[in-house]
Amino acid sequence: MGSHLDTVPNAGAFDGILGVVLAAGLVESLDGLKLPFGIEVLGFSEEEGVRFGVPFIGSRALVGRVDEELLGRKDGQGVSVRKAIQDFGLNSDEISKAALRDDVLAYIEFHIEQGPVLESLGQPLGVVEAIVGQNRLEFSFSGQANHAGTTPMNLRRDALAAAAEWIAAVENLAQRTADLVATVGFVEARPGATNVIAGEVRATLDIRHASDHTRTEALDELIRQAESIAARRGVIAKWRTLLVQHAVAMDPFLTEQIERAVQKASCQPHHMASGAGHDAMILAEKIPAAMIFLRTPGGISHDPSESVHLDDVAKALECGHHLLTRLAASQEFLGRTCRA
């Protein structure tokens, strides 16, 4: 059980770390209760990927996905992952020893929702059924920089105008496609002068959906639209992939047990997909994994105003206690082994 220790710059106090504290608090609350399995509390590093540009480094180690390329990745100060590990007094050559053993039964993660759904429903806890897949890409639009005062509108090859039209198309498609979210979170126009038509634009796209098929279809459509808009405006559109993360279903058996534990804690279970990535999706490659969400007041996360309700934390602890009790009595659960 656990979550991640890191977060993003200018963030709140509960993303990730609350799951670690809840896991530790749950173990403490057992107060001598004997279980037929051990519990390890995990605090993962680099879930967000802020420092090295690669998320889930800590949990990747448990599933054997830390290779030489990743170890060679450098942060903004030129420090590699390998060097950072050594600076913490650890040996990067022994990462393979962190791999999950065959007797590990499951991974369970408490996490704030980081969105407004549970609050809108008036529910303290959510049962996560899946973690959405996501693609991240960088698009470039290349036109012709020129004088803003002397170039007629019909003779322009304005890269920023092309990018702006495409960004509007991104929003439109996401609004028309159920449960799809698409975000252009970064735009850079060059040369960036008030009296110069933009000749080059870079823009990022983050697109997410619980269905890989739906997400891929939407992405293909947005690429076609970028090409079409660019061609009509005399601009060249290109793109490169930054990240592909497939959707991950949570373990059905664990999800059912969590639902019953939520009910036992006198809460109404709400089944939902996670729009954000989590360490649970990495561990799910090897072992059954499941997540429990806590309501996020205002739906605000990755911001200093991020918060939780203390009563919701108490309900999460109660739910966790009921869950462990159920799992301890389940022969189906105790008979499981780590997936190869």
Where are each of the predicted segments found?
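Acidic/His- and Gly-rich active-site-bordering loop/insert found
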Residues: 1-12, 30
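His/Asp/Glu-rich mid-to-C-terminal helical/loop segments that flank catalytic regions of hydrolases
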Residues: 129-131, 147, 151-176, 219, ...
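Zn-dependent metallopeptidase/amidohydrolase metal-coordination segment
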Residues: 2-3, 268-319
